[in-house]
Amino acid sequence: MSRLIFLNLPSTLNPDTFRKTLLSPATLKSTTITDTKLVPKRRFAFVGYKDAEEAQKVKEWFDGTYAFGGGKVKVDFVKDEPLKTGDKLNRGEKSKEKRSKEGRDNVQEKQEPNKRLQEFMSVMKGVDPAMASPEASTSTAEGTKKEKSVKGKEKSEEPEEAEADDDDAAWLRRRQAALEGEPSTPQLSADEQLILSTSRLFVRNLAFITTSESLSSHFSTYGRIDECHLPVSQTTGEPLGTAFLQFHNAEDALAAYKALDKTIFQGRLLHVLPGRAKPGQEGAAAGSGVVDGKVLGKRDEGRGEVKSKVDAKRKQESAKGVNWASLYMNSDAVAASVADRMGISKSELLNADSGNSAVKLALAETTVIEETKKYFEEAGIVLESLQPRVPRSQTTILVKNIPYGTSIQSLTDLFAPHGKLTRVLLPPAGTLGVVEFENHMDAGRAFKALAYRRLGNAVLYLEKGPVGMFKSETAPGVGPISTEQKREEEAKALAEKVESLPEQPDPTDEAGSTLFLKGLNFTTTTPHLQTVLSHIPGFSFARVQMKPDPKRPGEKLSMGYGFVGFKTKEAATKALKALEGFEIDGKSLEVKFAQRGAEDDRETKKGGDAEGGKTKSTKVLVKNLPFEATKKDVRELFSAYGQLKSLRLPRKAVPTSTGAQSTRGFAFLEFTTHTEAARAMEALKHTHLLGRHLVLQWANEGEEVDIKGLREKVKGEVRGMEDGGDRKRRKLDFKGGKEDEMDGLEV
């Protein structure tokens, strides 16, 4: 309820004075008015606000006051409960029906006189001379009796005739007639049929402050939204107050149309209409049928037409999600970049006689990725945001598969015709770029126009950048950065890094002197916890356990518990008794002694293994290995970052058609130290080997045992396949004996 109605306003009030009065209180200056409709003659007005909280503040301030110079003003919320569909359609029909029924009743009353009046008139009327004679009366009585007997005879004969004709066929005919008279199911209107065919809605009368995120959030309660498009003016760049919403399911679009039409959103009354299909998609929306054995909408197409349709479909699907790794780079560009730096040709770099070409290319890609990540960090990009499940921005585009030698000027010239650019980033290797637009409309237009477009000898792969990708909104490189500004930024970054480090216990503290605090308020921070507990005797440290925020990259969330350490175990015991039930930020604490290493185990289970320091394992599990990879390839690739103690590359038990046993697509590596394993995981987590992205994670100790068990199981299955007779005998053992016991029969 973000729309208010003001009653009992003075009739001399004008719109400008009314608006100024609404914004005059200091507490209401920050409110956003989205719509005002003043009707001075009727002394009321409608005012729309951005959200219900602002409307509530205004209502509490002006309700029952004399702020507008007239009588006492009454302020109330405008109800946005729309009439039901049946009431909308049948209200007029019901009123007409009621009036016509009343008219028929009046006519019927006029046509049917009162019975008592008729009886009175017959008594008061004189006797007819013809009826006074005895003969006439006798004949009249006989005629009356005769008529009564005839009528009685007819009435007695009707049931017999009905019973005679009441056979099954007649009953069925009457039943069918009754069914035909029943009301049929309501047919869908033309608007509803259009929505079911396109899954698209057109929304009007939006506030100019409406964003695609807020509108999508409002409509997404009825189903998944694939696209939200807010048109803007080509000259001023201001929104037009309209929007197009593309739903994933047509039923969800129809439900949103019925529920949200004529409702209030951000202080304005929405007008929801069915949206037409996008240009070029009318055929898909119209559906298809079969006539004379041929499918409508299909014809004999040439190879070129089919290829163009496939390309168009690929471009359309590319805008819906993440199709490539965020740091994907063209292998040819990587090789060219490294070869250029070394002063050699690509053929010399990838010479098969001098070493493994696949491993060389993978190591070169790893080097280029490290340089690119360092460049992006200096440019203010949050690397943690480059995850596939992070929400996507509407103004940032990642440009991948760029050929080597592309300059930042050529990249700017490619995207600038589609709109105003905020920033363009291109690392020294020139294999991955970032382009940010000022307007999401321009970014969408550029994405559609340049996706899968050829640039040099490569095809561009575009991906929408993640939300919160940049640390600051200001674009880097706008002006020369002074030495003082650079020092301030370095000092600020160092301070943030120091603050993010967890408090470590003093090595001189006794064992068992750390307490576990459960039930902390999620708003409680580590500095606040230290301030509250620092007065306790023997206090050493205090910290709130944090985890990364998946919705806001670079920020952290409280996990609702923490730890406090003391110098001695005796001090910890006294603090345990004092802190039990103690309230911090309105939450009562539950305190107990912490178990050594429990917090690390808890972090490993909940937080994952992203940083490597949360587990001390030296074993790494490598997934998504190409089946062509050999032990030599894997050993050469990983031995560049540490010494390997063991390497296991499981193979399939059943040989292929060529007679060789192919790998199963994963491997187990064991390094000498945990530091080497962590360094290898950090360096190779974005690397490709033979075109496949390597997926690295810490291996649990029990996984190898499971692999051995699976291997024994597969061996048993293969042995059973070879010994088919034994399997048949085991299937025929109906007495429930052991499978391995032989029954003495020979096959």
Swiss-Prot record:
Residue ranges constituting the RRM domain according to the UniProt record: 2-80, 199-277, 395-467, 513-596, 618-701
Keywords for this protein: Nucleus, Repeat, Ribonucleoprotein, RNA-binding, rRNA processing
Stored SMART domains: RRM (SM00360)
InterPro entries, A to Z: Mrd1_RRM3, Nucleotide-bd_a/b_plait_sf, RBD_domain_sf, RRM_dom, RRM_MRD1_RNA_proc_ribogen
GO MF assignments: RNA binding
Subcellular location: Nucleus
Secretion signal, residue range per the UniProt entry: none
Region (Disordered): 83-117, 129-169, 595-615, 718-747
Major localisation: nucleus
Biased composition (Basic and acidic residues): 143-156, 597-614
Gene3D superfamilies the UniProt entry points to: 3.30.70.330
GO cellular component terms attached to this protein's record: nuclear speck; nucleolus; ribonucleoprotein complex
Pfam families in alphabetical order: RRM_1
A Gene Ontology BP annotation from the UniProt entry: rRNA processing
Bias (Acidic residues): 157-169
Function: Involved in pre-rRNA processing.
Family listed: Belongs to the RRM MRD1 family.
Name assigned to this protein: Multiple RNA-binding domain-containing protein 1
Gene symbol of the encoding locus: MRD1
